[in-house]
A protein has these predicted regions:
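GH16 jelly-roll
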Residues: 45-276
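Bacterial Sec-dependent N-terminal signal peptides
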Residues: 1-46
């Protein structure tokens, strides 16, 4: 399978064993730095993908204490089995937590949540690192689609929908990619079932490279699906991070015993092709 490589390199000073005092000071500094919660992994400002350089255009590392509303708006619809609430989107401990609860709101027995980017994007590389909720009944998605400001999905406002990951939480060892055409008559172009590690036990990285003629899907940096999309209509796309209670995937009911639960995102990033 195809792999992508990060073009960032790291260089720095290394301490020799013959300089124990310097090594001790360096080790003590690192210990204090990490203990104080000041350590963070640098975000790659550029990536080398298929022989081309892509530059960071948008990112959220979720290192604050609340959702950054300069970047995001909230999903607030009632759909399938849940109502989506802004308060269920919590930023804490370096993660976006979309909290999932058993509570009745607007005649729905459960509440979910989601974020929708304020900006619209186009061709480039989209990536997130995420972990799905425990317990059956939840439809988690990392996807791209236009947005009309209504608080929910509106296919009439977009030409295409790109589903980078769709998972129904009763399934822990796989997910689906998908592509929909919404302009004119709806067409489900289809996708692939991707076998994975346990999605609710550890974080997994999922991504797609969106080009004018092709769409590449990646799981943990490995190519898992490809679509030829030269004839597919195009439109501006918002980034969606969402989780709703749903019957999708043949789900019969929500596993109440494992609630509350949460869909977790470590980060989301978008890179665009660097211009010569």
């Amino acid at each position: 399978m195809e792999k992508m490589e990060n073009d960032q390199t790291f260089s720095g000073r290394f301490f020799r064993a013959s300089d124990p005092e310097a090594w001790f000071k360096f080790t003590l500094f690192i210990f204090v730095f990490i203990s104080a919660g000041l350590f963070s992994t640098a975000v790659a400002q550029s990536l080398a993908i298929k022989g081309k350089t892509y530059q960071l255009r948008f990112s959220d590392e979720f290192n604050g204490t609340a959702v950054d509303t300069t970047k995001w708006q909230f999903r607030t619809d009632s759909k399938h089995w849940s109502t989506q609430l802004p308060l269920n989107n919590v930023v804490k401990d370096g993660l976006l937590q979309i909290q999932l609860k058993k509570e009745t709101v607007r005649n729905m027995a459960y509440t979910g949540g989601g974020l929708i980017s304020k900006d619209t994007f186009g061709y480039g590389y989209y990536e997130t690192r995420m972990m799905t909720p425990k317990g059956a009944g939840w439809h988690s998605s990392f996807w791209l689609m236009g947005y009309d400001g209504s608080g929910g999905t509106s296919p009439s406002n977009t030409a295409t929908e790109i589903d980078i990951l769709e998972n129904d939480s009763k399934i822990t060892l796989g997910y689906r990619t998908n592509l929909h055409i919404w302009k004119g008559t709806h067409k489900d172009v289809g996708g692939e079932y991707v076998s994975s590690e346990n999605l609710n036990q550890d974080f997994q990285t999922v991504a797609c490279l969106y080009l004018p003629d092709s769409l590449f899907y990646y799981y943990n940096q490995k190519l898992v699906d490809k679509k030829e999309i030269g004839s597919v209509p195009k439109s501006g796309l918002n980034i969606w991070l969402t989780c709703i209670a749903s019957f999708l995937g043949g789900t019969e009911k929500v596993d109440d015993a494992l609630l509350p639960s949460a869909l977790l995102f470590d980060y989301v990033r978008f890179y665009t092709l660097k211009k010569d």
